Amino acid sequence: MDPRERVPPGNSGEETVGEAFEWLETTLEHLNRVAVNHLPRELIFQVWQKSWAYWREEQGMSISYTKYRYLCLMQKAMFIHFAKGCGCLREGHGPGGWRSGPPPPPPPGLA
């Protein structure tokens, strides 16, 4: 038996760069919609703004790379939130948590 990881169906390496960018955009939009129900809006916007300031403006990385780094940070934040035993939807948020009102738009540059 070959111990190497098998390529899942549909991931033959023939995907285009455009499909990867589309995946990134879709994933970011979905993550932001979920995150707003679990993390303070201010935190979401600050993570985006700090990511943009550091990766895009200071380091000169591409917009896609900046979005990818933001995605990584937000995934870690959500993982920690859930690992601590998320009770947001069941018990509601405590101070500094979810704010009432309609969900905010995605961070600048992600719409």
Curated annotation (Swiss-Prot):
GO biological process entries: symbiont-mediated suppression of host innate immune response; viral life cycle
Quaternary structure, from the entry: Interacts with the P6 region of unprocessed GAG. Interacts with host VPRBP/DCAF1, leading to change substrate specificity of the CUL4A-DDB1 E3 ligase complex. Interacts with host NUP153.
Record flagged with keyword Glycosyltransferase: no
Protein name (Swiss-Prot/TrEMBL): Protein Vpx
Principal location listed in the UniProt entry: virion
Matching InterPro entries: Lentiviral_Vpx_assoc_factor (IPR053711), RetroV_VpR/X (IPR000012)
Cited Gene3D superfamilies: 1.20.5.4730
Annotated Gene Ontology cellular component terms: host cell nucleus; virion component
Organism: Human immunodeficiency virus type 2 subtype B (isolate EHO)
Subcellular location: Virion; Host nucleus
Entry function: Plays a role in nuclear translocation of the viral pre-integration complex (PIC), thus is required for the virus to infect non-dividing cells. Targets specific host proteins for degradation by the 26S proteasome. Acts by associating with the cellular CUL4A-DDB1 E3 ligase complex through direct interaction with host VPRPB/DCAF-1. This change in the E3 ligase substrate specificity results in the degradation of host SAMHD1. In turn, SAMHD1 depletion allows viral replication in host myeloid cells by preventing SAMHD1-mediated hydrolysis of intracellular dNTPs necessary for reverse transcription.
